[in-house]
């Protein structure tokens, strides 16, 4: 199976609770290798552009407010079947419905403050990765 990339965001709630290292370690233990990583704080304009597909929905403005409330860690993770592996690890959006042992079950507070974001398809991964990273910011994976 070919290598695949996904975008991972450790959201402001998890960064603010000093969970970044614990979450990153889980990804690495699962074989999701970081090939790009940085800490950012989105402006309202950036958050609106990233979440443009949700504009007009009732949760849109609270989502923008939350995603601009503090720093977050964005990264590109690479592995075979990276998107599905990542999504299995993070669990359902609603932490009360997330399986035990998933990141959201362990660290999330609510559907909005749910610790992490992950791409849901190869098309969204490509779009989301390009939003945060230029091609020259993405490194080849480290040798095993």
Curated annotation (Swiss-Prot):
Active-site residues per Swiss-Prot or TrEMBL entry: 117
Oligomer status and interactors: Homotetramer.
Binding-site positions, ATP: 11, 59, 87, 93, 104, 114
Top EC class, one word: transferase
A single BP term in Gene Ontology: CTP biosynthetic process
Signal peptide: none
Name of the protein in its database record: Nucleoside diphosphate kinase
């Amino acid at each position: 199976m070919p290598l695949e990339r996904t975008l991972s965001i450790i959201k402001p709630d998890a960064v603010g609770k000093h969970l970044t290292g614990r979450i990153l370690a889980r990804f690495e233990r699962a074989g999701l290798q970081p090939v790009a990583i940085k800490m950012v704080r989105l402006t309202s304009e950036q958050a609106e552009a990233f979440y443009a597909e949700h504009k007009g929905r009732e949760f849109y403005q609270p989502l923008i407010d939350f995603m601009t409330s503090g720093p977050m860690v964005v990264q590109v993770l690479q592995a075979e079947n990276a998107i599905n592996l990542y999504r299995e690890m993070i669990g359902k959006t609603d932490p009360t419905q997330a399986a035990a042992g998933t990141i959201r079950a362990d660290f999330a507070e609510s559907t909005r403050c749910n610790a992490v974001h992950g791409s849901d398809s190869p098309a969204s991964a490509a779009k989301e990765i390009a939003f945060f990273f230029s091609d020259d910011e993405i490194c080849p994976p480290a040798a095993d």
